[in-house]
């Protein structure tokens, strides 16, 4: 009877050792599977970060283009308002447009200028142009000038990031005529 209990305990011990071995094997497989899933998730996270950085860069470039176009629209609007005032006979003082600079990365650069002239005679000339080029960055330019006693100019430049600088000055000359009755 003692021998049968010993045999029974040995069988239980063997069965428990087998269960332990099976549990260790299942644990190792689960650990390998978890490590594989972790590696896949880390790869997906790295790819998501790269995609996010690329999308952020594209967004910043689009915002820079939008800013430049907004500046150009504001400049043309001011030029048109100045022309309307000049044609209606109202005096136009000096007008300045200020634009907050936005820098993304690297450096920034900009250029602007203004000029004025007056003379006799009448005439009106308008010229304008804008361009856009893309090559690991972007560049925008625009220009406008009008004659008839006034010259107006603006400039915009961008390099290695983004910036916008506009200087816009309007000068007018006026004369008064007095009529005499005889």
Curated annotation (Swiss-Prot):
For this protein, the record's Gene3D superfamilies field holds: 1.20.5.170
Region Tail, residue ranges: 84-182
**Keyword match DNA-binding:** no
Please state every residue range assigned to the domain named IF rod.
1-87
Q: Where is this region: Disordered?
A: 158-182
Q: Where is the composition biased (Low complexity)?
A: 161-176
- For this chain, the annotated S-S bridges are none
Q: Does the keyword Coiled coil apply?
A: yes
Q: Where is this site: Stutter?
A: 27
What are the record keywords, sorted? Coiled coil, Intermediate filament, Keratin
* Annotated region described as Coil 2, given as residue ranges: 1-83
- Which domain of life does this protein belong to? Eukaryota
* Assembly, per entry: Heterotetramer of two type I and two type II keratins.
Give the protein family.
Answer: Belongs to the intermediate filament family.
Q: What else is known?
A: There are two types of cytoskeletal and microfibrillar keratin: I (acidic; 40-55 kDa) and II (neutral to basic; 56-70 kDa).
Report what the protein is called.
Answer: Keratin, type II cytoskeletal 59 kDa, component IV
Species name: Bos taurus (Bovine)
């Amino acid at each position: 009877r003692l021998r049968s209990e010993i045999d029974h305990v040995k069988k239980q011990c063997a069965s428990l050792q087998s269960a332990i071995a099976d549990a260790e094997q299942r644990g190792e497989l689960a650990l390998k599977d978890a490590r594989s899933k972790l590696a896949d998730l880390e790869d997906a996270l790295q790819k998501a970060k790269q995609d996010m950085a690329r999308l952020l860069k594209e967004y910043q470039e689009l915002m820079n283009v939008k800013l430049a176009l907004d500046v150009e629209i504001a400049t043309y609007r001011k030029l048109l308002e100045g022309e309307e005032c000049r044609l209606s006979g109202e005096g136009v003082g000096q007008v300045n447009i200020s634009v907050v600079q936005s820098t993304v990365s690297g450096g920034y650069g900009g250029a602007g200028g203004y000029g004025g002239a007056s003379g006799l005679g009448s005439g009106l000339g308008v010229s304008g142009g804008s361009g856009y080029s893309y090559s690991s960055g972007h560049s925008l330019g625009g220009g406008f000038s009008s004659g008839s006693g006034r010259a107006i100019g603006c400039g915009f430049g961008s390099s290695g990031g983004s910036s916008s600088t506009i200087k816009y000055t309007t000068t007018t000359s006026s004369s008064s005529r007095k009529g005499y009755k005889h």
